Amino acid sequence: MHPKIFALLAKFPRVELIPWETPIQYLPNISREIGADVYIKRDDLTGLGIGGNKIRKLEYLLGDALSKGADVVITVGAVHSNHAFVTGLAAKKLGLDAILVLRGKEELKGNYLLDKIMGIETRVYDAKDSFELMKYAEEIAEELKREGRKPYVIPPGGASPIGTLGYVRAVGEIATQSEVKFDSIVVAAGSGGTLAGLSLGLSILNEDIRPVGIAVGRFGEVMTSKLDNLIKEAAELLGVKVEVRPELYDYSFGEYGKITGEVAQIIRKVGTREGIILDPVYTGKAFYGLVDLARKGELGEKILFIHTGGISGTFHYGDKLLSLL
């Protein structure tokens, strides 16, 4: 852990959910194919439940919840949400109750199946997006307060200034873990918290590394504004200035959760060439974007990809994926 980042983060409550540094691997076969050195930070191996990037955010979010005396955690997401499942699981591990406020078709597959197996309370609504779900979450929180409970509401994907600190910490880990001088760090951008944290961490260390986000869903002014606000608010928490701005590229194929032949093929290629499994919603799209941009020479010679996890999402989209291969 880089001492500068360690010192900045020391004042924030944190629960340790990740007992190790996640490894950085070189991808020799993919690198030869695209003409750039590609490395992967295995944040799919963060250790709790199905792993993934959300665990880093939850270390600070649940640390904050416990410091405020919370006894129940509420969060939102799609029925197959990685974030919702690992939030519920982490809360239970820490002795907290959890309520997952979800939208979508109730099928016993993927993360929704895991929610049920683990006995995590779920409430499914006919909502158009996570913003609408947050209204339901706040209503539930108010109801619990009237009952004398102490709820703590976590936004979609854990994308909040506190959650962003998890990937500021990740930059500190990368800085002392690898001797490679990366030109760019590439990550899937959904709710934006991971990309915001990477950008802020690179600013703090004054690293000449480009943070690159591959948008996997809603793209445009709303997303860029949200990302800017996350970075600004997290920087204010830490008392630092922002020097590095992220770059965003749209590889959503039109909408969140839309699976295409390109995504299916890149999942198969990375799996069979490197032995690493990507998911169709986040990392599959993001890695496809990486390959496309790298072939155009837009990411430099040495690229680090953050594997944000999400393997269980593959099973939710199984029939669709197979039909495209």
Swiss-Prot record:
Pfam families (alphabetical): PALP (PF00291)
Gene3D superfamilies hit by this protein: 3.40.50.1100
Cofactor section: pyridoxal 5'-phosphate
Keyword Hydrolase among record annotations: yes
Residues with PTM N6-(pyridoxal phosphate)lysine: K54
GO function term, MF aspect, one: D-cysteine desulfhydrase activity
Name of the protein described by the UniProt record: Putative 1-aminocyclopropane-1-carboxylate deaminase
